[in-house]
Amino acid sequence: MNQTYGRLVSRAAIAATAMASALLLIKIFAWWYTGSVSILAALVDSLVDIAASLTNLLVVRYSLQPADDEHTFGHGKAESLAALAQSMFISGSALFLFLTSIQNLIKPTPMNDPGVGIGVTVIALICTIILVTFQRWVVRKTQSQAVRADMLHYQSDVMMNGAILIALGLSWYGWHRADALFALGIGIYILYSALRMGYEAVQSLLDRALPDAERQEIIDIVTSWPGVSGAHDLRTRQSGPTRFIQIHLEMEDNLPLVQAHFVADQVEQAILQRFPGSDVIIHQDPCSVVPREGRKFELV
């Protein structure tokens, strides 16, 4: 699983970096030629795209390194750090757009030949839609937090390029403040995306539990298994591609140790079949030692 995960996530990061680099060169020319503040917004965003995607590429490769003596649970948390770094990059670009947009609202400047800007923006829009489609497929296959953060960023780019097209069209017909107004709106949306991305990264670093639906699946697997009378103390988290699952099984007091171990192994394999690559720890408890109030399964 890790090989497939690493290959897909690396390809997504390389594709994002290559596309952002190509679009940056095109947008530099378009901004120089037209003087559009909306194109400047897209240019700044491409610079952030490159920094974020390069960070993703380097961090993802590090996060896929196997566990060692100093990092016994692996390096998967590096993905969350990459997502947090992206949120800071994006917040910085949003603040820059705020300042530039306000300046151009106060003193609007007519742009040169909006048609060039429209052509460049259409190219950027098509390329970004293709990239987001590929990233969404990778996220569906890997559940990578780093690629998901990158995808959210490029999804905002799709909206941004659409808004830029409208702004350039309005400027073409003489409404010069439209350029700055749309750039300001884009900045607000980018900042919102950055804050949401940062929140998700922090939650992962704080070892947030797996989604309720996944935990319920684990409960259903465990409690329906022959030989298991009940279960309690389910604890879960995720680091990179690896889910960490801990649970206590309740078994009959007189069940031989060998048989209890066999049942626990079967339960572990069933969980791994549903969640491949997980790190599963199962503890067996005799029913008599489990407090009565603890016998009703609770999510922890």
Curated annotation (Swiss-Prot):
Parts of the chain that traverse the membrane: 24-44, 82-102, 114-134, 156-176, 178-198
Membrane topology: Multi-pass membrane protein
Family annotation (InterPro entries): Cation_efflux, Cation_efflux_CTD, Cation_efflux_CTD_sf, Cation_efflux_FieF, Cation_efflux_TMD_sf, CDF_Transporter
Key words of the record: Cell inner membrane, Cell membrane, Ion transport, Iron, Iron transport, Membrane, Metal-binding, Transmembrane, Transmembrane helix, Transport, Zinc, Zinc transport
Binding site for Zn(2+): D45, D49, H153, D157
Reaction catalyzed: Zn(2+)(in) + H(+)(out) = Zn(2+)(out) + H(+)(in); Cd(2+)(in) + H(+)(out) = Cd(2+)(out) + H(+)(in); Fe(2+)(in) + H(+)(out) = Fe(2+)(out) + H(+)(in)
Listed SUPFAM superfamilies: Cation efflux protein cytoplasmic domain-like (SSF160240), Cation efflux protein transmembrane domain-like (SSF161111)
Listed GO CC annotations: plasma membrane
UniProt superkingdom: Bacteria
Chief subcellular location: membrane
Gene Ontology biological-process entries: intracellular zinc ion homeostasis
Cell compartment(s), UniProt: Cell inner membrane
Single GO term (MF): ferrous iron transmembrane transporter activity
Protein task: Divalent metal cation transporter which exports Zn(2+), Cd(2+) and possibly Fe(2+). May be involved in zinc and iron detoxification by efflux.
Similarity annotation: Belongs to the cation diffusion facilitator (CDF) transporter (TC 2.A.4) family. FieF subfamily.
Complex and partners: Homodimer.
Name of protein: Cation-efflux pump FieF
Organism: Salmonella typhimurium (strain LT2 / SGSC1412 / ATCC 700720)
